[in-house]
Regions:
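Charge-rich, well-structured scaffold segments of protease-associated domains
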Residues: 10, 65-216, 252, 282-423
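His/Glu-rich zincin catalytic helix
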Residues: 1-68, 89, 102, 173-279, ...
């Protein structure tokens, strides 16, 4: 089953609209995606503050007024920041769209960045950041990125309490001018997108004008080649658990083996009955859950294996992970297991067709990481349905067995190279 084809419409100023129409529900989703994210801006802390501040007040209304209008008209808005994307998403009812689109334009074009709201949001983000820095899963992810990309690399940037404290209102105003007003976004429309909705959305986007020399651009720095395996630990003295994150650099979407390798990784740890779950969770009881996935970004493609475990079992989890990789690479799986892998992987793919919102997300990912949405979806299906035990074994042997890997641990096993949180 193919991914529904999106309709692409050029707008003024070089902006493109990408739409998926489905009128089964009278709801539309508008996503405005700027091709710049945390790795690209001068200060990622300023970006994390600026985006939610957009709805805290404009030159003509307060943040409370904005919240009341959205709620009264059955609309809600959120912002998301990725490594190379900044996204504003708005869900709205078609019957109230005429009242919502002018509000959205005002939010985007004329934010006031009121000082009192800025201080409230600053304190909220500082508290959230400090809480996040006590979670071993997050610390292992951050350490893994430093190991893959290097300390200080754009792709390894994180927000911090001290960083939030240092951001001034003037920085937010400047970043808004350079990102929202000067950098060309893409408009994604999904749901009950009719001619009226399209026209209102496109009229709103026309008010942005053309990109200027103040525009920001993506700062993609490829990850350096990993020559040997490494293992580092972020020590969390009072932690009862250790987060394990194994990153194995691998091939990208342009490689002919890419989609076949995805299926092999799925068999290893991509579903509840996978090799890793069956052994490390069900048989050994070392963790409540362990997973493996392919994580592709503009900088690199990596196979990521991650879980949390009691400190005592950290080495056992690592050992059993290698056992399962070796077993997958050493002999073909049985017919029953192969059927489960095919069926579960295919069901997961088809689930992305459930709504126009999940469909349009495929096209947003295409912009974010460069994986072709429509053709990539077909190739993933073809490789899942044609998967053989021999091919899965071949992929595991070729790309998983003995390949250099970065093992990032965060917890309190006390036996690894310590890495400070400030690194």
């Amino acid at each position: 089953m193919p991914l529904p084809q999106a309709v692409r419409t050029p707008l003024a100023g070089g902006i493109e609209a990408v739409s998926i129409a489905d009128d089964s529900q009278p709801v539309s989703r508008i996503s405005i995606v700027w091709p710049v994210g945390q790795a690209d801006v001068p200060d990622c802390n300023a970006l994390a503050l600026m985006m939610p501040m957009l709805s805290e007040g404009t030159l003509s209304m307060s943040g409370a007024d904005i919240a009341d209008i959205l709620e009264f008209n059955g609309a809600w808005m959120k912002t998301d920041i990725g490594r190379h994307t900044t996204i504003l998403t708005l869900f709205l009812l078609n019957k109230t769209a005429e009242r919502i689109f002018p509000l959205l334009a005002d939010i985007l074009l004329h934010p006031a960045f009121p000082p009192d709201a800025l201080e409230r949001l600053r304190e909220k983000l500082i508290a959230q950041t400090r809480l996040r820095q006590h979670k071993v899963k997050e610390l292992a992810r951050q350490l893994s990125n430093r190991m893959i990309f290097g300390v200080g690399a754009p792709a390894a940037r994180i927000t911090s309490a001290e960083g939030f404290k240092a951001v001034s209102r003037e920085e937010l105003v400047d970043l808004h001018r350079r990102l929202i007003l000067s950098t060309r976004p893409t408009l994604y429309l999904a749901g009950a997108v009719n001619g009226k909705i399209e026209q209102m959305a496109m009229t709103m986007m026309d008010s942005f004008g053309s990109p200027t020399d103040k525009a920001l651009a993506a700062n993609v720095v490829p990850a350096p080649a990993m020559q040997t395996s490494s293992r580092c630990m972020e020590v969390v003295a009072d932690s009862l658990q250790t987060a394990v994150r194994i990153a194995i650099p691998t091939i990208g979407p342009s490689h002919p083996d890419y989609y076949s390798l995805q299926t092999a990784v799925f068999a290893l740890g991509g579903h509840f009955g996978s090799r890793l779950m069956s052994n490390i969770r069900e048989d050994k009881g070392y963790t409540y859950g362990i997973s493996a996935m392919m994580l592709t970004t503009r900088e690199t493609s990596d196979i990521i294996i991650h879980c949390e475990t009691d400190n005592r079992f950290t080495d056992s989890v690592l050992n059993e992970t290698e056992v399962e990789i070796a077993r997958l690479a050493s002999r073909p799986m049985g017919d029953d297991e192969l059927k489960i892998v095919r069926h579960t992987a295919h069901s997961g793919l088809l689930a992305t067709l459930d709504s126009p919102f999940t469909v349009i997300d495929n096209y947003i990912v295409e912009q974010a990481v460069g994986i072709p949405a429509a053709s990539g979806f077909i190739r993933r299906q073809e490789n899942v349905l044609a998967a053989s035990a021999e091919k899965i074994q071949e992929m595991a042997e070729k790309y998983l067995l003995g390949t250099p890997r970065a093992i990032a641990l965060a917890g309190n096993t006390g036996s690894d190279q310590a890495v400070s949180q400030e690194q």
